[in-house]
Amino acid sequence: MISPLEKAGILVEALPYIKKFSGKTIVIKYGGHAMLNADLKKAVMTDLVLMKFVGINPVVVHGGGPEITGMLHRLGIESQFVSGLRVTDAPTMEVVEMVLGKLNKEIVALINGLGGRSVGLSGKDANLIMANKKYSNDCQDIGFVGEVTGVNPQLLQTVIQEGYIPVVSPVGISTEGETYNINADTVASAIATALKADKLIILTDVEGILEDRQDKGTLISTVKMEDIPRLIERGVIQGGMIPKVECCMQAIQTGVATTHILDGRVPHSILLEVFTDKGIGTMVVSD
C-alpha cells in the first residue's frame, strides 16, 4: 500500500512534466498485448484521459494484427505473410477494414466511458492518410498493402482543438481511390511528423531494446541514432524491432523531438514514461 506521503511525492514528481508537455502533442501507437488484456486496455485509456485533462494532446494510432488474423481464421481465409507484411487481397482487405473499424470504435467507447472525449477516424476520412501501393523487399506483389505518401494534419488539429482525442485506424487511400492496409507504426510516425509532435511512443510486447534479450537488466534506456546500425549488425536489434526503430528514426529525422519504445504489458506505461524522472523503455534520440 502506498502511503499518503509517497502519493504526494508521485504528484510532485509529475508536476514539472505536466508543465513541460502542456499544450504539446504526443502520438501513441497502441498495439500488442495492451490491446488484448482488459486491465491493460483500461490502464492505457486512463493514461490518455489523464493526459488530456492536464493539457496534453494525445493522438492514438492503433494496430489490430492478432484480431485480423483471428477473424480471417474464423472466415476460413488463410493468413499469409511476406517479409513480415500481411498479403492483402481484396477479400482480406475487406476483413482488415471491418476489424480495424470495430476496434477503433471499441477504443473510442472506452475513452468516453472513462470521462474523456474521443473521435474515431479511418485514414480514409478527409484523405487523412494518403497512400501508394507497397511491394515486399524482394519486389513481390502483396496486394492492398500501402505506404504513406501524405497526411492531412488539419483534420487532426481540428479534432484536437475541439477537445477530443483522435483515434486513427491505419487504413489509407490512394489518389485513385484504392484502400490500403498500412503498418500502424509507419502511420504513427507519419502522423507524429505531420503534427510536429513532441513525442512518438510505440507500445510493444518487450521491455525495449535489450543488449541481451534473455536478461531484462540489460535494457538500453537511451540509444543514439548513430549507434543503431551497429546494434543491428550485432543482432541486438533484430526481427520485428528493426522496423519499429526505423519508424523512430524517421520521425526524429523529420522533426519529432523524442521517440520511445515502451513495454505495453506494464500497466500505465505511458504515464510512467511521460511523468516520471526515470521513465521506462528505450528512448531513441538524435545524434
From Swiss-Prot:
One of its GO terms (molecular function) is ATP binding. It comes from the Bacteria. Disulfide bonds: none annotated. It is an enzyme of class 2 (transferase). It is found in: Cytoplasm. One of its GO terms (cellular component) is cytoplasm. Transmembrane segments: none annotated. Pfam families: AA_kinase. The record marks 29, 244 as: Transition state stabilizer. Catalyzes the ATP-dependent phosphorylation of N-acetyl-L-glutamate. This is Acetylglutamate kinase. It comes from Desulforamulus reducens (strain ATCC BAA-1160 / DSM 100696 / MI-1) (Desulfotomaculum reducens). The gene is argB.
